[in-house]
């Protein structure tokens, strides 16, 4: 299933858990030189990436896996003696609009992912908790279609994301207990990979990257209005780095293209690629970006 050898993945995960992750917080001090282990729930809200979706030989378009960023985040905290009880309630294709009004493939009307999240938070108000919110990209996706970018669509959808995400977070924060931490998840642009072998698609990649940057700006402003940090996934994928590097099988490309090829399925041949979802290493990179935003309890 993977496009990275198992031994490399295992080594990378070990490094990510032990060395690369900065020890930011799910451990609190109860006295001089003493750490008190922390147990907390982890509510994972979002779309397909929140579920670790990747293409497989059985489902080339993608299926849920246990190698998503939530899984790596739980493993990284476990390596530090921290127990996160993971609850994944995301749904592939989820948008902020569907989150509010329903109509996805996972929750029968009148239920929604938002209702599921609110019910969960209400029943865990006296617990430590971590909530990640991974929304927005699917709202933008209809504007990035068949290697064309629709600026009017982008503007309209970003305004919708701003309104809907604000409403979603307000409801979540209202029912969450006092010891619940929220972290927003930013986005990378998988379509950057389209620029390496086709001049026409290179123009599309440029505009798609512009649209994703604006999406992240909107998300960041909404999260900041609630004093919620946002994981800088775009930076983890080096979206702004255009330094030329050599990639085996591809040649000389900008570093942002190389990163997307290394961290997603976009540069893989059929039937597994091209696919916009992260691979194991990509999900590890997202997990690390989230980890960097976790503050001490």
Show the residue positions of the predicted features.
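Serine-esterase "nucleophile elbow" of acetyl-processing enzymes
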Residues: 35-93, 131
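Acidic carboxylate-rich catalytic motifs and surrounding loops in phosphoryl-/glycosyl-chemistry enzymes
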Residues: 84-94, 229-238
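Short, low-complexity, Pro/Ser/Thr/Gly-rich segments in the mature regions of secreted, periplasmic
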Residues: 287-297
């Amino acid at each position: 299933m993977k496009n990275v050898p198992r031994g490399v993945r295992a080594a990378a995960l070990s490094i990510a858990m032990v060395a690369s992750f900065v020890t930011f917080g799910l451990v609190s001090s109860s006295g001089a030189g003493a750490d008190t282990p922390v147990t907390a729930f982890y509510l994972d809200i979002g779309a397909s990436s929140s579920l670790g979706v990747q293409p497989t030989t059985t489902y080339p378009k993608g299926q849920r896996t246990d190698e998503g960023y939530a899984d790596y985040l739980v493993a990284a905290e476990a390596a530090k003696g921290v127990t996160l009880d993971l609850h994944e309630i995301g749904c592939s294709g989820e948008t902020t609009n569907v989150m509010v009004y329903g109509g996805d493939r996972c929750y029968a009307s009148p239920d929604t992912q938002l209702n599921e999240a609110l019910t969960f938070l209400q029943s865990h108000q006296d617990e430590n908790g971590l909530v990640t919110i991974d929304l927005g990209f699917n709202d933008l996706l209809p504007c990035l279609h068949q290697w064309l970018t629709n600026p009017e669509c982008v503007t309209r959808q970003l305004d919708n994301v701003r309104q809907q995400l604000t409403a979603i977070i307000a409801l979540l924060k209202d029912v969450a207990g006092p010891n619940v931490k929220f972290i927003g998840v930013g986005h990378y642009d998988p379509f950057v990979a389209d620029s390496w072998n086709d001049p026409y698609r290179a123009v599309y990649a440029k505009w798609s990257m512009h649209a994703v940057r604006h999406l992240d700006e909107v998300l960041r402003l909404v999260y900041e209005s609630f004093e919620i940090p946002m994981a800088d996934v775009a930076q983890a994928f080096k979206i702004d780095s255009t330094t030329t590097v050599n990639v085996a099988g591809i040649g000389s490309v900008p570093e942002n293209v190389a990163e997307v090829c290394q961290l997603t399925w976009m540069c893989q041949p059929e039937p597994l690629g091209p696919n916009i979802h992260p691979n194991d290493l990509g999900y590890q990179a997202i997990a690390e970006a989230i980890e960097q935003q976790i503050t001490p309890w």
